[in-house]
Regions:
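Pyridoxal 5′-phosphate
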Residues: 1-298
Length: 298
């Protein structure tokens, strides 16, 4: 809960689970978007301009779910501490949890959200980790469970499943190596028509498990349907809005050209993805791309 008035900031590529609640505060708060650069990373210069003494809340994702860009949480926290230390910092860690480390206490993060289904846990279970400054209102009233913050019988199997998933998640894995191998294969397949949508996959500002690229001129939905026949499943944009045939707001925030955005495909790697599986997927893509590029409109 926050006092009325003041500024609320969220990044241009936030998940709708964060963006929509922020937008709902318009009229009560001055709600502003923090822009991205071409790699999909928060522009710190723009954030510095947007931070005002009356800023109440800053929402930023640890890793963008479409581009795989890693946000500079340390620098964001430092700007907050210098310009508006009273502002709450909320981090959506759904795509970063167990893949990247984060120290809430050291950075002064006030709340951190995570979800079980992104680490092979059950769907419908997650956690909101709150720091000592955070005060939240009850989500629902009734029996007073969860310290009276969320009444209702706890989802005990889900909670146990989340813990089991955390304990079982392989800390030592080769996700980045597998992703880089896929990246090189796709570059070979599309040649000069290959476009990367996000940061350099080998860099520290790229998550180890997400690769977004365009194989121009083949439209993403055409390639998706072709690959389904091979039981290779990739995504165009966010999996949460896969039925909406419109350009990705994330790619739009990165100023990706329309034709390139229409060909964008997102690949997700997990600790159990093998080089052999990636090679199989790349072989299927190569076969379909060679045929489909002849028929796609120019």
């Amino acid at each position: 809960s926050m006092q009325r008035g003041g500024r609320v900031l969220y990044t241009a590529g936030e998940h709708p689970a964060v963006a929509a609640p922020c937008e709902s505060l318009k009229g009560t708060f001055d709600v502003q978007q923090i822009p991205y650069d071409a790699a999909g990373v928060v522009r710190l210069d723009a954030l510095e301009e947007l931070l005002t003494p009356d800023t109440r809340l800053i929402c930023v994702m640890q890793v963008n779910n479409e581009s795989g860009a890693v946000m500079p949480l340390c620098e964001i926290a430092q700007l907050r501490d210098r310009l508006c230390p009273q502002a709450m910092l909320h981090v959506d860690g759904v795509q970063g949890f167990m893949r990247l480390s984060v120290d809430m206490r050291a950075l002064g993060i006030d709340s951190y959200a995570l979800s079980g289904h992104k680490i092979h846990g059950p769907k419908g279970i997650g956690a909101l980790v709150m720091g000592p400054r955070m005060r939240v209102a009850a989500r629902m009233l009734g029996g007073g469970q969860e310290k009276a913050l969320r009444s209702g019988t706890e989802n005990t199997p889900g909670i146990a499943g989340l813990l089991a998933a955390i304990e079982a998640y392989p800390r030592d894995n080769n996700m980045r190596a597998v992703k880089l191998h896929l990246y090189e294969r796709l570059r070979e397949i599309a040649g000069e028509n290959f476009r990367l949508n996000g940061p350099d996959p080998a860099s520290d500002i790229a998550a180890p498990h997400i690769l977004n690229c365009s194989l121009v001129p083949v439209r993403s939905e055409t390639m998706l349907y072709a690959l389904e026949g091979d039981r290779v499943y990739v995504a165009n944009g966010s999996a949460c809005s896969s039925r909406k045939q419109k350009l990705s707001p994330v790619l739009s925030a990165m100023n990706v050209p329309r034709r390139q955005a229409e060909s964008a495909i997102r690949f997700s790697i997990c600790p159990y993805t093998t080089m052999e599986q990636v090679d199989f997927a790349a072989d299927c893509i190569a076969r379909h791309y060679e045929m489909l590029k002849r028929y796609e409109r120019r």
